[in-house]
């Protein structure tokens, strides 16, 4: 059999995972997933994590477990630092990886449309950490509101 083509997929969101699942069926490819986290999570349910209805473990699944049955997939936890197209390599904070094909599946970034005060004050909810931060802020404000001596203070904490 010919040598496997090296495919590096940076980003383990829906797009990256779906591509990897399709490519993994073809043994001509050896696939490396690079992601900053060692788990995939289901963003549509982040609001339930932030409201304490479910725990983060209910919406996250380890990449290594997801692909443990596949011999042509490996996981590299790290952050993309640099792409070297001439050398067909990428550099991460945890080493250099060679590729024949590179897929950048990095997701989205919130656009605050230049409103720095909104960016500073907002409680975003795009990651599990952000959902937990929102949850903790909500719970702390509710606790503080129960001890507030004035209605205006209670309203400020609850709105």
Feature annotation, model-predicted:
Residues 2-76, 81, 155-159:
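Beta1-alpha1 glycine-rich phosphate/pyrophosphate-binding loop at the start
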Residues 2-4, 73-158:
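FAD-binding core/adjacent interface of flavoenzyme oxidoreductases
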